[in-house]
Amino acid sequence: TDFVAKNADFVKLAQDILDAAVANKCKSIDEVKALPMGGHTVAEAVTDRSGITGEKMELDGYNFIEGDNVAVYDHMGRHMLCTMVQTNKPAEEEAHNVAMQVAAMNPVALDEASVPQAVKDEELKVAIEKTKEEQVKKAVEAALKKAGFNLYIAESEEHLEEGIMKGNITAEQADQIRELKKTTAEQKAANLPEQMIQNIANGRMNKFYKESCLLNQEYIQDSKMTVSEYLKSADKELTVTAFKRFTLRAE
């Protein structure tokens, strides 16, 4: 709560933990939790403070960027959403603007090469399945239209039952629709052109990279350029080398 967050002892504990993490050059949250503090570990110190305040507390986030040229952005100055951006050379204004970009657009990686392979594999899998579903749906709709059936009525079992109740179709016609949808979907799914599916899925992946990779994203202050292009408009050699984003809000 705000009451606890503004408490002097709580603020001091948070600052002490941060100072210890920086001094010991911790690389992970587990390393931070294991640090000694007041005869205990950091994790135990947090638990003790939780018992004193009566509110559940957990140290569940730790981010750092090592090196120079790091800009920090605290959204609205409330410590609820903070970002860090590191550039390859001094560029205070540009780094600050990109830090705001990170806050607003929540990129998952710096560029395509930085996206974890597991994420790429999952996104491609989803893209392929979605493409297949769309192709099957188009084939089913085309078959229904050709047979003269209303697409709204044929859309779902609920609509079919509604159509029968209102007298728009007969029970026999509803069965015909069900059978046509089933056979058409099976036939289309068994004969989908693999190369076409892959090409469409690749297009979806390119869209994913554009939306999810920081340097590929449209720059929020000028949608006519990407973040990478914005940086290069200031300095042809300027780029982002690392970024971090941390929020206390569920997203």
Predicted region positions:
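N-terminal assembly/interaction segments in proteins that build large macromolecular machines
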Residues: 1-251
